[in-house]
């Protein structure tokens, strides 16, 4: 299970390939 662009990310739910977890807002953004 992974988060896509604009979705919440945290320790147990990483971002999908091609995305990164932006600090503080904890949302996935496109690389």
Curated annotation (Swiss-Prot):
Its main location: secreted. GO terms for molecular function: ion channel regulator activity; toxin activity. Probable ion channel inhibitor. One of its GO terms (cellular component) is extracellular region. It is found in: Secreted. It comes from the Eukaryota. The lineage of its organism: Eukaryota, Metazoa, Ecdysozoa, Arthropoda, Chelicerata. Disulfide bonds join 2-16, 9-21, 15-28. The presence of a 'disulfide through disulfide knot' structurally defines this protein as a knottin. This is Jingzhaotoxin F7-15.33. The keyword Disulfide bond applies. Expressed by the venom gland. Keywords: Disulfide bond, Ion channel impairing toxin, Knottin, Secreted, Toxin. Belongs to the neurotoxin 10 (Hwtx-1) family. It comes from Chilobrachys guangxiensis (Chinese earth tiger tarantula).
